[in-house]
Amino acid sequence: MTYVLFLLSVSLVMGFVGFSSKPSPIYGGLVLIVSGVVGCTIILNYGGGYMGLMVFLIYLGGMMVVFGYTTAMAIEEYPEAWGSGVEVLVSVLVGLAMEVGLVLWVKEYDGVVVVVNFNSVGSWMIYEGEGPGLIREDPIGAGALYDYGRWLVVVTGWTLFVGVYIVIEIARGN
């Protein structure tokens, strides 16, 4: 399981390197969506089933809509991929070399020293448990958001609506 998480972490970082090397919006959106799926899989492996599902549905659903729209607005006849230009290819290869160097350095020293200590965050940690008296906190948190934080949900929805309206007005050009 450790090697699976290690491989997922490396692929998550490589997805960020692939996006930050500034390819065409088509490929950049694809890399962000794949990186989001990998991040949700990491959350699922740590025991956060509900949180991983919600991030997958909300974040990736929004990302697909946004990148579908930006791809339609910025369509190119010959989109720039990672191997089409020397600058893009060099930046991807430099990022890959840095990631491989970091992985080899971590494997050489047999681990990483923890700099940040999480002592008093017991209720925020993702955990897995199967028992009659155990209540998982991630689904209850969503219920509390809609019960006690109903105005936060309304403000968030209104903010998203205004953001979409502003993007449409900017893209329209009037």
UniProtKB/Swiss-Prot annotation:
Tree of life domain: Eukaryota
Function: Core subunit of the mitochondrial membrane respiratory chain NADH dehydrogenase (Complex I) which catalyzes electron transfer from NADH through the respiratory chain, using ubiquinone as an electron acceptor. Essential for the catalytic activity and assembly of complex I.
One CC-aspect GO term: mitochondrial inner membrane
Membrane topology reported for the UniProt record: Multi-pass membrane protein
UniProt keyword annotations, A-Z: Electron transport, Membrane, Mitochondrion, Mitochondrion inner membrane, NAD, Respiratory chain, Translocase, Transmembrane, Transmembrane helix, Transport, Ubiquinone
Annotated source species: Pan paniscus (Pygmy chimpanzee)
Name of the top EC class for this enzyme: translocase
Protein name per Swiss-Prot or TrEMBL: NADH-ubiquinone oxidoreductase chain 6
Pfam families: Oxidored_q3
GO biological process: mitochondrial electron transport, NADH to ubiquinone; mitochondrial respiratory chain complex I assembly
Cited InterPro entries: ComplexI_Subunit6, NADH_UbQ/plastoQ_OxRdtase_su6
Cellular compartments annotated: Mitochondrion inner membrane
Catalytic activity as recorded in UniProt: a ubiquinone + NADH + 5 H(+)(in) = a ubiquinol + NAD(+) + 4 H(+)(out)
EC number of the protein: 7.1.1.2
Subunit: Core subunit of respiratory chain NADH dehydrogenase (Complex I) which is composed of 45 different subunits.
GO molecular function, one term: NADH dehydrogenase (ubiquinone) activity
Transmembrane segments: 1-21, 24-44, 47-67, 86-106, 111-131, 151-171
Disulphide-bridged cysteine pairs: none
Family recorded in the similarity comment: Belongs to the complex I subunit 6 family.
Entry annotated with the keyword Lipid biosynthesis: no
